[in-house]
């Protein structure tokens, strides 16, 4: 009887129905939390955590999540089979409100810049509990977060940051008269006191105790691409809850650790900095003056690998270029591959193509037609290396060069189209919110938080 029930359970389970059911509950929780009804809010959070569907979906997401490296925890498990996941489901059913975490395993990884960083990897069962809690916490704080907090939301593209900067610095908003104050909170960012985070966190007491136990075990709150919680995004969610409220000090955009304040000619930057220091002192965080950068739009400024500069020739009086550091890192990555004698020309071309494609896709709204970003010198060097190989001649090396660098037809879209597309929704980021469950097979739902009308 037990084996028959298990086989029937595995065959009849539809993950589309599971995601639809959890999505409906999260949408209801979002509306209740926006009105800030505490009683219904806690009841809906407990219903989401106690659902069998949410537990099974959390186990499935942990088992099938693709990381850069399969990093096991202290127990040594990378994934669970069907019987182990079924036992974990039954264990979560009775112990989710009194969860005991195991020790975290220290693992050294390479960062995007080539630096060695130390990460603390939890066990699979602890990751499942974090997924389960995230289902109940994320819609609540999504309704209360500032609309210009773009640090962790997976449904927002990174190009929306360009749209917001264009909105604040275009000629229609007198952007040439404004200044920009850029802050970087990533240096020396260490949280010593978690009591302020527990006060901001909106969840039942049992979930708060579980998160506090996880933080006491040594779980680090950070925005990192190489973190084991890259898909879960639980660390960045808690850190966004911790830093929530800094966007209300002034008109700004926050993406992770980076803040960009837009200052009018009347605004005083010293008063703004005093407000920021006061806010960070309440959070028990240290902040250095070297991490502050004040610049005008005419001189230009760098933000997230882009360089924004005022220009009368462009449509919006604002030009976007790749930043100097971003361009140099891109060139060094290509030069390392070209100058490596262990690879042949065909392997070099296959390794160069995705790097060039990703870089041009990231800067598809930037002005790459300038001579500085035409890549003519690196193309000449690559052609010389390809031609020096005995197996290649002039025509074959020319075809390899075209395969590597000829991806500009797909990208380099007009910045005017981006700006016109930005003004289509009249109630941008105020009444209509976007929920995306991820994946190409799902639809994008826009719905009003007051009347509940769904816009497809």
UniProtKB/Swiss-Prot annotation:
Q: Where in the cell is it found?
A: Plastid
* Predominant localisation class: plastid
One CC-aspect GO term:
plastid
The protein's UniProt keywords, in alphabetical order, are: mRNA processing, Plastid
Q: Which GO terms describe its biological process?
A: mRNA processing
Domain of life from the UniProt record: Eukaryota
This chain's function reads: Could be required for group III intron excision.
**Family indicated by similarity:** To group II intron maturases.
Q: What is this protein called?
A: Maturase-like protein 1
UniProt organism field: Euglena longa (Euglenophycean alga)
Chain's gene name = mat1
